[in-house]
């Protein structure tokens, strides 16, 4: 009996300790607010709400300050995905609180979460946008016989259905006189699967969002067929938050938006360092990250501008055409109140920012080769010399060629060079562009079609390679 009683006493003591531990854990859990953030490390125009934000720890710093000021404790969980679709699925399941994605997925997110008040989301900020639409592109294999949209008829094309890149494909095909439903065979694939399919020849083209087109071209695995800027429709990425979560924890959403603004400021002020952090966090080459996220590229600008919301509304017919898309009150889905508050808290004029559609971080400075200031954002270019912490500005593409020529003559290595397309303005790799000489001026183009349009209008122009242009430009 003594043995049985002793054993019972020991078990009871253990149970009491376990119960005490559970109650302490529950109490600790009640004192800790968890925020789950869904992001896409390789979709680099969301970096100010994802990869860069995480790398710099701005959100954790903002939340820690709330705790230090007498608030609750906070725990941030980051979840990385390849596309916006799984982020939306997790928000529907109430497992992600704040997420970032492209314009088409944002609409799908709002549509699919609206049936449940606990999962219902709102669009609270923009991460980055491109006024003409160059965030989506179509690429083909190098030396592909496909040289125009017309050549895609009857071919297999990889894209991610429901994404902005698929919307681009359908609009581009329609504009090229090809029925997007029957004129090509579209394979619904994740970006990395589509990239492999293109490389292996299983598909003849890939329509995708950044950074995939630039990555494949940089790796010499593809060349650009169609620049989304030809559609001249803004494309953007942004942030959605679950309303129920935001209502329960408004201080968390406020901290997130302030942290996004911190990340945006950091990217503008230290673009090459930001590109390095994003490259480390995403596995992308730094040169590719800087193509899109460097000065004169994507506009990293948070306000919910009317031009973007109008483009948003124009995306709805496409989403309805592909199937399951419940009507969404877009004006009700968009909520700029938290962002307005964040701007006011920083002493910034939100209305002025909304009204400004210019890139907030253009290429600037003095061209050291031409010895003149860089004043025309539409022509401004950059040379990134190996070992430099900042890129060297060039007043225009011709000046950039001179800078490259001079650097080579001095034994310096050019890590990357960036120029704006002469027709569309798209920031692109100088050594991957198609060049045309017009007198003493050299013009870069992203696609064969763009170069041909110029040559047709200007018969005196001469097409040449990048190396030819560097070799013959006057120093």
Residue ranges and their predicted role:
Residues 29-179, 185-188, 204, 233:
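Short, glycine-/small- and polar/acidic-enriched structural segments
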Residues 44, 249-326:
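Secondary-structure end/capping motifs
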Residues 367-372:
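Short cysteine-rich clusters marking metal-coordination/redox-active sites
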Residues 135-145, 235-251, 436-438:
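A bilobed periplasmic-binding-protein/Venus flytrap-type ligand-binding module shared by bacterial periplasmic
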Residues 114, 192-281, 398, 406-425:
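Pocket-lining segment of extracytoplasmic ligand-binding domains
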Residues 23-26:
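Bacterial signal peptide processing site
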Residues 320-365:
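Conserved C-terminal helix/tail region of periplasmic/extracytoplasmic solute-binding proteins
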Residues 15-21:
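C-terminal motif of bacterial Sec signal peptides marking the signal peptidase cleavage site
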């Amino acid at each position: 009996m003594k043995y049985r009683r002793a054993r019972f006493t020991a078990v009871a003591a253990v149970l009491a300790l376990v119960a005490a531990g559970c109650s302490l854990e529950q109490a600790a859990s009640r004192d800790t607010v968890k925020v789950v953030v869904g992001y896409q490390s390789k979709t680099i125009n969301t970096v100010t709400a994802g990869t860069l934000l995480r790398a710099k720890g701005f959100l954790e710093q903002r939340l820690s300050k709330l705790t230090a000021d007498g608030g609750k404790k906070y725990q941030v969980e980051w979840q990385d995905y390849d596309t916006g679709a799984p982020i939306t699925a997790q928000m529907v399941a109430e497992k992600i609180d704040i997420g970032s994605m492209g314009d088409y997925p944002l609409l799908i997110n709002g549509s699919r979460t609206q049936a449940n008040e606990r999962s219902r989301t709102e669009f609270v900020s923009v991460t980055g946008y491109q006024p003409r639409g160059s965030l989506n592109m179509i690429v083909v294999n190098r030396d592909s016989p496909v040289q125009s949209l017309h050549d895609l008829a009857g071919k297999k094309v990889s894209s991610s259905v429901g994404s902005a890149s698929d919307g681009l494909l359908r609009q581009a095909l329609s504009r090229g006189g090809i029925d997007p439903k029957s004129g090509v065979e579209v394979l619904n694939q994740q970006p990395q699967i589509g990239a492999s399919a293109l490389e292996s020849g299983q598909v003849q083209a890939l329509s995708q969002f950044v950074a995939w087109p630039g990555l494949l071209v940089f790796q010499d695995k593809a060349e650009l067929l169609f620049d989304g800027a030809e559609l001249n429709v803004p494309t953007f990425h942004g942030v959605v938050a679950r309303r129920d979560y935001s209502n329960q924890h408004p201080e968390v959403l406020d901290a997130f938006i302030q942290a996004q603004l911190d990340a945006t400021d950091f990217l503008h002020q230290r673009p090459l360092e930001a590109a390095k952090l994003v490259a480390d966090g995403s596995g992308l080459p730094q040169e590719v990250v800087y193509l899109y996220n460097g000065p004169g590229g994507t506009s990293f600008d948070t306000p919910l501008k009317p031009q973007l919301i109008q483009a948003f509304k124009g995306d709805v017919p496409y989403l309805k055409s592909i199937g399951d898309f419940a009507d969404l009150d877009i004006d009700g889905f968009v909520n700029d109140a938290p962002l307005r508050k964040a701007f006011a808290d920083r002493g910034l004029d939100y209305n002025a920012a909304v009204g400004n559609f210019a890139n907030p971080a253009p290429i600037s400075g003095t061209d050291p080769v031409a010895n003149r200031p860089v004043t025309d954002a539409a022509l401004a270019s950059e040379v990134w010399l190996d070992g430099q912490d900042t890129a060297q500005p060039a007043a225009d593409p011709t000046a950039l060629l001179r800078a490259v020529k001079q650097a080579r003559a001095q034994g310096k290595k050019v890590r990357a060079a960036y120029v704006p397309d002469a027709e569309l303005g798209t920031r692109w790799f100088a050594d991957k562009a198609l060049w045309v000489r017009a007198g003493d001026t050299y013009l870069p183009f992203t696609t064969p079609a763009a170069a041909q349009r110029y040559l047709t209008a200007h018969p005196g122009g001469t097409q040449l390679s990048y190396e030819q242009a560097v070799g013959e430009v006057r120093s």
